[in-house]
């Protein structure tokens, strides 16, 4: 009987974590939506590449700094109320974004989407620390990351189809209505309370949470681990989430559908690779080896995609899939962040790790847009205002412009591989 109760408890835990992961997948779809709507958004809001990068990256201006308070709030208040409220905020932000032609109002909508999304990933990991065994954390972070990329794949393929048929406004409004339904599902399905066989690290006071944050933030290993995650994740935060589809269309001559498919194959590789990397890391009780291997191979693949001319569509698709498969080792950093920190501050530790990881999107998405405009200006001698002529959007930038603007991605990934030599091996063991 006791064994059966344990199995039932474990099943409930996985289902609850799955609901949280569903919200993460939903917010991920909202995150990458601008990448499949580039032309429509630039026409609607009259944007240059710099402006397009800025309006997308506003998401991160809320998402990144919110990670620290989100971690403390998760430890203090639990995931149920916070994830439900966060989903509702995403819905409001989406409606605000689609209901205006003003850049700043739209940017405010993206900010709200980022604000709500900030709770998603950390919320799932917090649910895992409450409901699942500690030795499953790397696998849970991998599975959660995988479900997030399912949202990205849906965005790259189905959103592109709906945008073509219905327009971007109706398409995003449909996602907002789905978010309303999801809000009720989260409230009814998620439970915070720890069960009989598992103890949660809930922080009893905000003051204690701030003390824990101070301890964690002073741990240099947390920053090394987070910086690895940030740099090896650049193919997602900078390339696939925003600039991947425009690059594949402009530089390799792929159609909108072909570019979306190739981009989604990167997410598919990550979807399959993240839980496998987590399982492999848990099984061998080592973190650094899969992190080093994944970052090293992914760096080579990124260089080939960016700097090898004459790639046909099939080659690009295979390379994108393999890139996603290998850099999915990034998902391990959340387990490492937990294992480098005391158990009562699990949410805070993983939130700080996630904040560092997502800095890449906040800082570098708009930088790519600026570098594209700057490279075009140097090459053509034309004013950046030319970029506002929508008919010229797909003629402005050539492969050289993109190679210059995206060069820091493989450089950053190479640095990530080197950082593993400065990271402590936790052997998949977390302090209590």
Residue ranges and their predicted role:
Residues 76-86, 282-296:
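Cytoplasmic membrane-interface "Motif A"-like loop-to-helix N-cap segments
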Residues 65-104:
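Conserved MFS/SLC helix-loop-helix module at the cytosolic interface between two early adjacent transmembrane helices
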Residues 2-9, 193-226:
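Juxtamembrane intracellular "pre-TM" segments in multi-pass secondary transporters
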Residues 46, 78, 99-105, 133, ...:
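Helix-breaking motifs and short loop linkers at transmembrane-helix boundaries and internal kinks
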Residues 144-195:
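Helix-loop-helix hairpin linking two adjacent transmembrane segments in secondary transporters
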Residues 34-36, 219-275, 334, 361-369:
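Extracytoplasmic gate region of multi-pass secondary transporters
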Residues 109-148:
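Cytoplasmic helix-loop-helix junction between adjacent transmembrane helices
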Residues 88-101, 296-310:
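C-terminal ends and interior cores of transmembrane alpha-helices
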């Amino acid at each position: 009987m006791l064994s059966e109760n344990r199995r039932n408890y474990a099943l409930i835990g996985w289902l609850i974590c799955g609901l949280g992961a569903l919200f993460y997948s939903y917010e991920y779809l909202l995150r990458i939506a601008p990448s499949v709507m580039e032309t429509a958004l630039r026409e609607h809001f009259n944007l240059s590449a710099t402006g397009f990068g800025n309006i997308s990256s506003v998401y991160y201006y809320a998402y990144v700094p919110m990670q620290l308070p989100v971690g403390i709030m998760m430890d203090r208040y639990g995931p149920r109320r916070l994830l439900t409220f966060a989903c509702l905020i995403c819905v409001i932000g989406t409606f605000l974004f689609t209901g205006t032609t003003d850049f700043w109002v739209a940017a405010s909508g993206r900010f709200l989407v980022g604000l709500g999304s900030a709770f998603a990933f950390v919320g799932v990991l917090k649910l895992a620390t409450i409901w699942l065994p500690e030795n499953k954390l790397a696998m849970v972070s991998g599975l959660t990351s995988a479900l997030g990329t399912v949202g990205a794949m849906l965005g790259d393929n189905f959103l592109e189809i709906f945008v073509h048929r219905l327009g971007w406004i109706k398409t995003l409004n449909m996602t907002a209505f789905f978010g309303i339904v999801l809000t009720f599902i989260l409230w009814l399905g998620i439970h915070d309370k720890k069960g009989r066989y598992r103890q949660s690290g809930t922080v009893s006071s905000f003051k204690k949470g701030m003390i824990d944050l101070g301890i964690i933030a002073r741990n240099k290993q947390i920053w090394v681990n987070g910086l690895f995650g940030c740099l090896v994740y650049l193919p997602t935060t900078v390339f696939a989430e925003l600039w991947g589809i425009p690059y594949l269309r402009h530089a390799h001559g792929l159609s909108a559908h072909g570019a979306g498919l190739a981009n989604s194959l990167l997410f598919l590789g990550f979807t399959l690779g993240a839980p496998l990397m987590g399982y492999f890391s848990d099984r061998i009780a080592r973190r650094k080896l899969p992190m080093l291997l994944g970052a090293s191979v992914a760096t080579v693949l990124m260089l080939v995609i960016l700097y090898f001319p004459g790639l046909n569509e099939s080659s690009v698709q295979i390379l994108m899939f393999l890139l996603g498969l290998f850099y999915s080792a990034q998902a391990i950093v959340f387990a490492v962040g937990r294992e480098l920190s005391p158990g009562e501050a699990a949410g805070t530790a993983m939130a700080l790790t996630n904040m560092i990881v997502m800095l890449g999107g906040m800082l570098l998405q708009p930088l790519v847009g600026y570098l594209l405009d700057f490279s075009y200006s140097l090459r053509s001698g034309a004013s950046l205002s030319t970029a506002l002529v929508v008919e010229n959007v797909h003629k402005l930038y050539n492969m050289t412009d993109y190679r210059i603007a995206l060069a820091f991605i493989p450089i950053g990934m190479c640095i990530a591989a080197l950082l593993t030599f400065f990271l402590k091996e936790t052997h998949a063991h977390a302090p209590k």
